């Protein structure tokens, strides 16, 4: 199947486009491809579908109105973020080191400690919040990301910390490095379409069912040589630039400004994928 992320491919779908006042070029340029029925089009990136076009309407404005979180609408490099199974071992995610906005909370353990007086009624546990990069400010349910300084409050019981971090601060380097572009794009795409009157949205928190003991499998242990040289827990998957040492996990990589191996200043990091 042709790649509909490409404008040229989308344009080819408008061969029998029936709307004279909106050119195929305009529609394709705004991320849409023609579904081949009536005047229905779909965004190749967020999957929102729009129909019943009226003269004078602006495809770009309508796209933003109905799917404000669409990565195409927001100008994210959606084409460059797709990873295929054929080239994953050669794929890297690059982030320039700016430094954490709150160095005091660069380490996960410090973020966990900040939640010592976190309201007990909150469904989000301190470990979950800290893992997603947040520390507690000490007021209400106000939290902030240690790296991008993004603040979130008014947490709902069903809110997942990582998903909320992505939805509101998708450009955060910590988010991009730890979760990866595929996860970021997935969360954004799922959130970008506004619920319609026929859309059912689940608000219930997931319920964990007990797993029979016989089905529990031990996770394979990481070889000592591959353990992060900062936390000694996670696997090394980040390469420091310019020295080239792969000695840190994604969570720890942004907590240091010097390579722990050679002590050279780190200017950027690369997330590496091993086949």
From Swiss-Prot:
GO terms for biological process: negative regulation of apoptotic process; positive regulation of canonical Wnt signaling pathway; positive regulation of protein ubiquitination; regulation of cell cycle. InterPro entries: BIR_rpt, IAP, Znf_RING, Znf_RING/FYVE/PHD. Zn(2+) binds at residues 145, 148, 165, 172. A zinc finger (RING-type) spans 228-263. One of its GO terms (molecular function) is zinc ion binding. Acts by blocking cellular apoptosis rather than by preventing viral stimulation of apoptosis. This is Apoptosis inhibitor IAP. It comes from Cydia pomonella granulosis virus (isolate Mexico/1963). The gene is IAP.
């Amino acid at each position: 199947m042709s790649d509909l992320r490409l404008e040229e491919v989308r344009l080819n779908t408008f061969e029998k486009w029936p709307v004279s006042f909106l050119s195929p070029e305009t529609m394709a340029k705004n991320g849409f491809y023609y579904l081949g029925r009536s005047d229905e089009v779909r965004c190749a990136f967020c999957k929102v579908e729009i129909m019943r076009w009226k003269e004078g309407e602006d495809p770009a404005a309508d796209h933003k109105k109905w799917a404000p979180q669409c990565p195409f609408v927001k100008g994210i490099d959606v084409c460059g973020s797709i990873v295929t199974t054929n080239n994953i071992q050669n794929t890297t995610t690059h982030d320039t080191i700016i430094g954490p906005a709150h160095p005091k909370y660069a380490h996960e353990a410090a973020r966990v400690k900040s939640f010592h007086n976190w309201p007990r009624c909150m469904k989000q546990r301190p470990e979950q919040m800290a893992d997603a990069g947040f520390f507690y400010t000490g007021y209400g349910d106000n939290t902030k990301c240690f790296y991008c300084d993004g603040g979130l409050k008014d947490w709902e019981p069903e809110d997942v910390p990582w998903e909320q971090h992505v939805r509101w601060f998708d450009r955060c380097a910590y988010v991009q490095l730890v979760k990866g572009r595929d996860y970021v794009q997935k969360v954004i795409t799922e959130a970008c379409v506004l619920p319609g009157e026929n859309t059912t949205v689940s608000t219930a928190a997931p319920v964990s069912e007990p797993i029979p003991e016989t089905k529990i499998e031990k996770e394979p242990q990481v070889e000592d040589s591959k353990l992060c040289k900062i936390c000694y827990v996670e696997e090394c998957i980040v390469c420091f630039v310019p020295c080239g040492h792969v000695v840190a996990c994604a969570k720890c990589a942004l907590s240091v400004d010097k390579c722990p191996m050679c002590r050279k200043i780190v200017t950027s990091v690369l997330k590496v994928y091993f086949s």
